[in-house]
Amino acid sequence: MKLGKKEGRVLLGGNKPKGDAFEHGFFVEPTIITGAPKTSRLFQEEFFAPILSVAEVKSLDEAITLANASEYGLTAGIFTQEEHEAEAFFDRVEAGVIYSNRRGGATTGAWPGVQSFGGWKNSGSSGKSALGPHYIAQFMREQSQTRVKG
């Protein structure tokens, strides 16, 4: 939250929740941050917390460029009524899980147990998704053996 307050404006949340259940640990209320520069860590890193950094962009192209500028690519989403915008987003965004108009469920965008889940770039496992057909191979040591009897 210090970074959000330093580089932008905390529009909503940003505090530690009240109550005994939150006494120990690193809990934070759902938070919306605006006004941070697009080069801020708030747009460049993955924060596994309920934090949303909002930036104003002039076009879908600028939004996709901003999303792809991060070295991470776990999940990305778009809300649109225009099918051509969703299609362009799906074709160009560099993330392992992509969704459009998803309003409920997991914040990752994937439906756990139904869809594979994994990131691209420095998110995840080299593009191999959990539940995907090749995911288990990363935990195995492959070996080729040839025996010629003569």
PLM segments and residue spans:
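Short secondary-structure junctions
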Residues: 6-16
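Conserved C-terminal structural/oligomerization subdomain of aldehyde/semialdehyde dehydrogenase
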Residues: 20-150
